Amino acid sequence: SPALSARVTRTVNTLAVLPTSSWFRPLSADASKMDGLNVHFAAVDEVHEHTGPEIIQKLNTATGARRQPLIFEITTAGHDRHSVCRQHHEFSVKALEGALPHETADPWFAFIATIDEGDDWTDPAVWAKANPSLGVTVKIDDLKRQIDEAREMPAQQNAIRRLRLNEWTE
């Protein structure tokens, strides 16, 4: 927008608001290069691909000087049940079920879009549970084709169930 463009300076990898010394840019995937950050907002994508908890730990501790920091994580399900992604998934389920004290759960917002345990993953009636934008950004015909292929090629099933239906797999 013109109003936003007037306030934000753009470079190749950074958006900056110079009067407030604020910036938004991609960070290294190497946690050892993340010391000294002062984070107000961080978006962490594809948490299931993180090989360890170090990046998220660094971002969490880098919010200490902020009154209302926000760390936003988005991911599909993974396959490593010992990963930081799985730990955050299990914490999220507990928060959503009310199984955590409110002072622990209240700062944690979770939205999990997945098919239910016991659902037939090949049934088109359940696909929208894991794909809230089904028919908009996720094309029904594409999803149907991929699921039909996975039904016939069992080696594809874990990937489709994990990446398209958000089920944890082995």
Where are the regions that the model predicts?
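Structural motif
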Residues: 41-43, 72
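Non-catalytic, compositionally simple segments
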Residues: 53-170
